[in-house]
Amino acid sequence: MSRVAKQPVPLPKGVEVHVADQRLVVKGPKGEMSVPFHPAVELRIDDGGASLTWSDNQNAQAGTMRAILNNMVQGVSQGYEQKLEIIGVGYRAQAKGKTLSLSLGFSHPVDYSVPDDITIETPTQTEIVIRGIDKQKIGQIAADIRAYRPPEPYKGKGVRYAGENVRRKEAKKK
């Protein structure tokens, strides 16, 4: 049996969970999310939270659905946030509405358009904060922005996640 799927997902106040037309729908104070729900897994709502039941050969699917449900509940109740740091001379970012403009040493600025349900802020020119309710979408946007100029191992310049350790290499010796 899946150890992940055995544990119930606690539901905070103001969060509703139900399955409609093979889709798992979660509503909360920060918004609403829905994802396709596997037909071999069943959802039960108790006073302690939401739990899953499944047939024996669907252990992996049940664990996946439980993790997705937990991420959705946390997203609509608290939200998610990902921070990026820009390191390098002349490297900077600026948020203008739903567009993020990045100067990363190219001959042109890189413009990244942000989806409607995600907000991007730049507290300083070298920090980017991505906020929203969908954990997967926030992670993908952060990875897309980082991919424009990933940190290089010799000087450490580039876009990195906050707190990311970049392994440095020694320069070539004569």
UniProtKB/Swiss-Prot annotation:
Keywords: Ribonucleoprotein, Ribosomal protein, RNA-binding, rRNA-binding. The keyword Cell membrane does not apply. It comes from the Bacteria. InterPro entries: Ribosomal_uL6-like, Ribosomal_uL6-like_a/b-dom_sf, Ribosomal_uL6_a/b-dom, Ribosomal_uL6_bac-type, Ribosomal_uL6_CS. The keyword rRNA-binding applies. One of its GO terms (molecular function) is structural constituent of ribosome. GO terms for cellular component: cytosolic large ribosomal subunit. PROSITE patterns: RIBOSOMAL_L6_1. GO terms for biological process: cytoplasmic translation. Part of the 50S ribosomal subunit. This protein binds to the 23S rRNA, and is important in its secondary structure. It is located near the subunit interface in the base of the L7/L12 stalk, and near the tRNA binding site of the peptidyltransferase center. HAMAP family: Ribosomal_uL6_B. PANTHER family: 60S/50S RIBOSOMAL PROTEIN L6/L9, LARGE RIBOSOMAL SUBUNIT PROTEIN UL6M. Belongs to the universal ribosomal protein uL6 family. This is Large ribosomal subunit protein uL6. It comes from Acidithiobacillus ferrooxidans (strain ATCC 23270 / DSM 14882 / CIP 104768 / NCIMB 8455) (Ferrobacillus ferrooxidans (strain ATCC 23270)).
